[in-house]
C-alpha cells in the first residue's frame, strides 16, 4: 500500500492533510475497519494532525497587525496577538 495512502506528510498542504485526516476520522467513527488497520490509520492521523498544527503555527507567525499613528495612518506592523 505504497500509494497516496503513504504519501509523504511533510510535503502536504494544510488542505490536503486536513482532508485526509477528516477521512480517517470518518473511517474510525464508522467502526468497520479491522483492528490492525485501525491502529495504522490512527497513527497516520496523528502524523497528519501534527502536520496541520505545524502549518498553522507557520501561518500564525506570518500574520501581522498593522500599527497606526495618532491620526490613524499606517506606520508599520507588529506581530498579531490573538490571545
Curated annotation (Swiss-Prot):
Q: What class of enzyme is it?
A: hydrolase
What EC numbers are recorded for this enzyme? Answer: 3.1.11.6
What this protein catalyses is: Exonucleolytic cleavage in either 5'- to 3'- or 3'- to 5'-direction to yield nucleoside 5'-phosphates
Q: Name one GO molecular function term.
A: exodeoxyribonuclease VII activity
Read off the Gene3D superfamilies from this record: Exonuclease VII, small subunit
InterPro entries per the UniProt record, alphabetical: Exonuc_VII_S (IPR003761), Exonuc_VII_ssu_sf (IPR037004)
- Protein location: Cytoplasm
Predominant location: cytoplasm
Does Cytoplasm show up as a keyword for this record?
A: yes
| Domain of life the protein comes from | Bacteria
Q: Name a single GO biological process.
A: DNA catabolic process
UniProt KW keywords:
Cytoplasm, Exonuclease, Hydrolase, Nuclease
What does the subunit section of this Swiss-Prot or TrEMBL entry state? Heterooligomer composed of large and small subunits.
Identify the NCBIfam families for this entry: PRK00977.1-3, xseB
Give the protein's biological function: Bidirectionally degrades single-stranded DNA into large acid-insoluble oligonucleotides, which are then degraded further into small acid-soluble oligonucleotides.
Q: Which PANTHER family match?
A: EXODEOXYRIBONUCLEASE 7 SMALL SUBUNIT
Query: Would you tell me the protein name for this molecule?
Result: Exodeoxyribonuclease 7 small subunit
Organism (species): Afipia carboxidovorans (strain ATCC 49405 / DSM 1227 / KCTC 32145 / OM5) (Oligotropha carboxidovorans)
Source species taxonomy: Bacteria, Pseudomonadati, Pseudomonadota, Alphaproteobacteria, Hyphomicrobiales
Amino acid at each position: 500500500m505504497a500509494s497516496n495512502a503513504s504519501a509523504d506528510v511533510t510535503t502536504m498542504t494544510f488542505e490536503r492533510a486536513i482532508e485526509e485526516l477528516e477521512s480517517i476520522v470518518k473511517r474510525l467513527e464508522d467502526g468497520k475497519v479491522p483492528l490492525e488497520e485501525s491502529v495504522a490509520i490512527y497513527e497516520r492521523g496523528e502524523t497528519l494532525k501534527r502536520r496541520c498544527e505545524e502549518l498553522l503555527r507557520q501561518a500564525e507567525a506570518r500574520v501581522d497587525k498593522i500599527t497606526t499613528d495618532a491620526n490613524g495612518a499606517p506606520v508599520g506592523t507588529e506581530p498579531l496577538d490573538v490571545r
